[in-house]
Amino acid sequence: MPQSAEHVLDHVELFRGPEYQQMLAKKKIFENPRDPAEVERIKEWTKTAEYREKNFAREALAVNPAKACQPLGAVFASVGFERTLPFVHGSQGCVAYYRSHLSRHFKEPSSCVSSSMTEDAAVFGGLNNMTDGLANSYKMYKPKMIAVSTTCMAEVIGDDLNAFIKTSKEKGSVPADFDVPFAHTPAFVGSHVTGYDNALKGILEHFWDGKAGTAPKLERKPNGAINIIGGFDGYTVGNLREIKRILELMGIQHTVLADNSEVFDTPTDGEFRMYDGGTTLKDAANAIHAKATISMQQWCTEKTLSFAAEHGQDVLSFNYPVGLSATDDFIVALSRISGKEIPEQLARERGRLVDAIADSSAHVHGKKFAIYGDPDLCYGLAAFLLELGAEPTHVLSTNGNKAWQEKMQALLASSPFGQGCQVYPGRDLWHMRSLLFTEPVDFLIGNTYGKYLERDTATPLIRIGFPIFDRHHHHRSPIWGYQGGLNVLVKILDKIFDEIDNKTNILGKTDYSFDIIR
Amino acid sequence: MSLATTNSVAEIRARNKELIEEVLKVYPEKTAKRRAKHLNVHQAGKSDCGVKSNIKSIPGVMTIRGCAYAGSKGVVWGPIKDMVHISHGPVGCGQYSWGSRRNYYVGTTGIDSFVTLQFTSDFQEKDIVFGGDKKLDKILDEIQELFPLNNGITIQSECPVGLIGDDIEAVSRAKSKEYGGKTIVPVRCEGFRGVSQSLGHHIANDAVRDWIFGHIEAEGKPKFEPTPYDVAIIGDYNIGGDAWSSRILLEEMGLRVIAQWSGDGSLAELEATPKAKLNILHCYRSMNYISRHMEEKFGIPWCEYNFFGPSKIADSLRRIAGYFDDEIKEGAERVIEKYQPLVDAVIAKYRPRLEGKTVMLYVGGLRPRHVIGAYEDLGMDVIGTGYEFGHNDDYQRTAQHYVKDSTLIYDDVNGYEFERFVEKLQPDLVGSGIKEKYVFQKMSVPFRQMHSWDYSGPYHGYDGFAIFARDMDMAVNSPIWKRTKAPWKEAPSAKLQAAE
């Protein structure tokens, strides 16, 4: 018997002993298993160029896509406002999924409600669900704002949020002047980054453009402030805090829009804070007067930035700035737009990042990397690798489009280290599997699901992205700013050194290289 | 010692009733009336728990429930390892349910096993406008080409499929014919159907009936010689290896397990199940339908069992053995005896650390009742429980066999109610899901996920009980719960002392 009270074995070890192994071997006869030789043959075949060609010829099937659907991004953006309850109109299972997904990544509560539409709503529309739902949410959870988005069910049947919210207010679900911004977020268009954009634009439109016809439109009186938008970001906690620190160092008047850095990082002290932090509704409204709106992620904010530009603001977007040059560009832009000087403190932080790169770049230089993730994240990481002298080789974004591809290609063309790199918009992780077999690289950068690629292709995975379910707390540290760049560098170096150690640790065989100093 | 155990049964009953009244005050009148039917205090001797169940969730309340797709793809079909399960519709559903349920299996993933792959038709706007059938047709071809060792395919419908009038049954039939009778199963588990995951279980069971059992030839032979001791494990999803730590006991008592439904299961096992002499049913809620069907159609008896905690395991082994001859009955006694030293050692180690601690549960299919015995084996006291998607027959079983007098019962509880109940009752442990975990930990209440075993497990069987005991101890007795208040802040409140 393998189990004992003194040394309790769980799933990691329990099944490895002879009792369970014999049991599992005996189970095989009931499974009608494939011939092991055939399994081996197909396994090897999936590694070939021939398989890759068939794999890339896929037109309909997606296997292991690296993207989620719009409402997830809408929920993520909505909780970044003061006491705001995201309300997703449609089937209720979706909301259970978004909440679970966000909680698994952040290891934090994730509050969101559904209008719980079922068959009858599919036939008659979901107006009653909206009316009852708003009334219940308002009374139970005492929000300051309810931000409505939609699941694909409500979109397919064509529910009209604007009309439904208006009717619900007339029926007294919430007070007439209670803020209920909305955004249509069909899951069959775009991805979670699109949903982020739609929801944020919906909220700004609500405050700036007369609250769906119930208030006068705000008149813009330009001031010197800058709005910052983080975009959909698994590192939102660390990153937004770092950006705010930089803005404060520079003395720039600012508003971070959709600031969810507090709600996804509340303390454990005996109190559950369903709402915490967030952009105040007053600040959201006053953001119209800002001189400029800066987006840290272009493809998360295309509509939102156009909207800000239409209101007369200067707009500027980055592509998930990571590392030295991208942070330089960001800091210089902040200084240019605000007219503020860049403080010596930031120059020192920059110098420290340069110092660290100079100390360590020999270990990164020339290493080949595959990267996948959201379009902006891929761009930012590729740019950083180029300046480390590393060679991005495959860059894949399931939710990247043609414009993204072109921009990526221009970036790669600008560096001698980017010459051997291919860009793959709209592809998935099963495509990546073929790439890693046919054109191997030294390291893979991606989210938790990359561990399947690491297992299959033996490409070491550096976990950067969303979601990260199987490592804890990394979202609390920034990867933006010079300090964030240092964190990314350390993540990459740690994996590189671990790999060298793993390859050199066999006693008496390879351990001549098992160096104590690297 | 928590507040909850310091009173008499009558006092607890009165307090729980009062608590329910207090919670209902938050609602608009109409909602309060509806929710009142789902909350109650169990009265000893009653045949059920006195709550309504399996009724639509109320909009806007933050129900914890999921949908029919989650019940079919996520629970019943997803673990069948040698079939490809397509999440048919937009990308999200498959993405959020990808690999998160911990249905363990042995196989070469991507080659002959597919559980932890995310296959989706990733619907775009044009698929909604023009329909998804042509795309589905092509997807099936692409699966055949790229994953040639798959033994079958299921199509798990997401919401839009049923709204746009796609005929996935016709596509399935045509493609099955094209591929020489290949098993292709269309499942109408659109998320808007029914009130919870529960209808998805039922729809998935019916799909097995119609598209697996309906297609095996009457003369179809299992590829093994039947014995009088062949049983099938029904309703065990092998979370963290649960079905394995169950199977080993059944085989040690002399039975032969010919199929696992559905954790680490295969199409061949589903097809062979009509040859079983007895179906043993763990998750009654999700698989009673197919068990009843096999009883009617193939004359296979079924019996429920419970492999959580030594008391219930011993009862169950004896109950299962009761369907067989003396050899098996002796086998059951032999197994119970064999594991008794392990049970004694686990209880000797952990019971003193857990004795008298109170627990509140809120889980899915069988666990709101099934795990109560395991807690009691450790001296713990379940003071509140409820089902996410239970029906009245679940509450009957709970009332008749599991809960104590005056236990607080909450059906389809929502975020608000659950927080208030826990805040007032201050249990020493809450067992629920990922959406609840961090809420209660913030409140300094120890917590274990009772869907995923909090990434531990198995919890079934004797081997699993040792892990269960270890895990409950590490949650309840983690030193961190005594350090959640900053020392310079006010003295700990009564609720914090309770949590200690």
UniProtKB/Swiss-Prot annotation, chain A:
[8Fe-7S] cluster binds at residues 69, 94, 152. Its EC number is 1.18.6.1. It catalyses: N2 + 8 reduced [2Fe-2S]-[ferredoxin] + 16 ATP + 16 H2O = H2 + 8 oxidized [2Fe-2S]-[ferredoxin] + 2 NH4(+) + 16 ADP + 16 phosphate + 6 H(+). GO terms for cellular component: molybdenum-iron nitrogenase complex. GO terms for biological process: nitrogen fixation. GO terms for molecular function: ATP binding; iron-sulfur cluster binding; metal ion binding; nitrogenase activity. CDD domains: Nitrogenase_MoFe_beta. The keyword Oxidoreductase applies. Gene3D superfamilies: Nitrogenase molybdenum iron protein domain, Nitrogenase Molybdenum-iron Protein, subunit B, domain 4. Its cofactor is [8Fe-7S] cluster. Keywords: ATP-binding, Iron, Iron-sulfur, Metal-binding, Nitrogen fixation, Nucleotide-binding, Oxidoreductase. It is an enzyme of class 1 (oxidoreductase). The keyword Nucleotide-binding applies. Belongs to the NifD/NifK/NifE/NifN family. Tetramer of two alpha and two beta chains. Forms complex with the iron protein (nitrogenase component 2). Ala-187 is present instead of the usual Ser that would serve as a ligand for the 8Fe-7S cluster in the oxidized state. This is Nitrogenase molybdenum-iron protein beta chain. It comes from Bradyrhizobium diazoefficiens (strain JCM 10833 / BCRC 13528 / IAM 13628 / NBRC 14792 / USDA 110). The gene is nifK.
